[in-house]
Amino acid sequence: MHKQTRDHFNKFLHRVAELNHVADATQKFNVEPSVEQKLLEKIRETSPFLTLINHITVDQQEGEKVYIGVNSTIAGRTDTSGNAERQTRDVKTLSNDKYRCEQTNFDTHIRYNTLDSWRHRPEFQSLLRLATSKQIARDRLMIGFNGTSVAADTNRTTNPKLQDVNIGWLQQLRAHKASAVMSGKKIGNLNDKDYPNIDAAVYDAAHELIEPWYHDDELIVIAGRKLLTDKYLHLIGDNDKPTERRALESLMVSQLFGGLKTIAVPFFPEDAFMITPLSNLSIYTQAGSTRLYYLDNPKKDRIEEYRSMNECYVIEDYDACCLVEGIK
């Protein structure tokens, strides 16, 4: 490590220790609440999708969901001229489903030569933080859309999409409301298909699988980029004019499926789509669970950051969403 780089890194460690009221950042410590919130905000800001959903800090590792759903409509009328009385309705969905935040490790390293290349940059400390924040955001998306289990010892080789790190949103829906999940549907113009096109599939799923009191403007289709590409690629290919191609490419970003706004999100399964209000998806982090430890490892010519936090992926109300997967 270059002498100037060493000086920058030591200042970084000193600042981390100062903010967290510890003597030494190279000894494992619990992150201060205010710093913890800033770290979580930095992660969220690096991903457009993560800025659209809920990020909630909870006190307990396990407990009741924070938001409440509704289990029916509430508008009505009662003729009280006789013996009948007006009756209130409980708007809270009664559910035994609880959240549980699992410890997740985000351990990274940066080699000395990379740090040396940053030594003349005034934002040296910000670069150190940003490198980790970006990858944590990517991992959260990958877990949210692909996670199916919580393994004591995760295996990145057999689970390249982090399927064994935590239980993601799609798996939560499969486990807790299987009736809101369709699979194996065929889409196309041939006679043996279930739907003539993706629009028909989305329209049917929204009206058949989601409770009617959630049929409002907040419903969004979350899809893999392949579904969007399959629908509009032939249009782009048929247009050689740059202006027309740009217009069509822009259309793919904000297009409607079945009359609903649609967004393509990285790491979402290519053969699936989910319909839900974005406010129905949450990531819970247990307050005070973030721990940090920095190690200067000359044996490997790198610095290492060991970060962990307790987190979970929550669907607030299963009645407000559905999943169509395994599309053929």
Regions found by a protein language model. Give the residues of each.
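Alpha-helical scaffold segments that mediate packing/assembly in large oligomeric complexes
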Residues: N105, Y112-A201
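Assembly/oligomerization interface modules of large self-assembling protein complexes
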Residues: T26-H109, K161-V165
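Ordered core of a single globular domain
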Residues: N191-D238
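Short glycine-rich, low-complexity/disordered patches
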Residues: V22-V35, M142-T154, H215-I222, R245-L248
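Sequence/fold signature of self-assembling virion shell proteins
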Residues: H2-S47, D164-K186, K193, L228-K328
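Hydrophobic, Leu/Ile/Phe/Ala-enriched alpha-helical segments that form helix-helix packing faces
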Residues: V16, I136, R140, A205-W213
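Signature of extracytoplasmic/envelope-associated structural regions
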Residues: K3, D7, E18, L52, ...
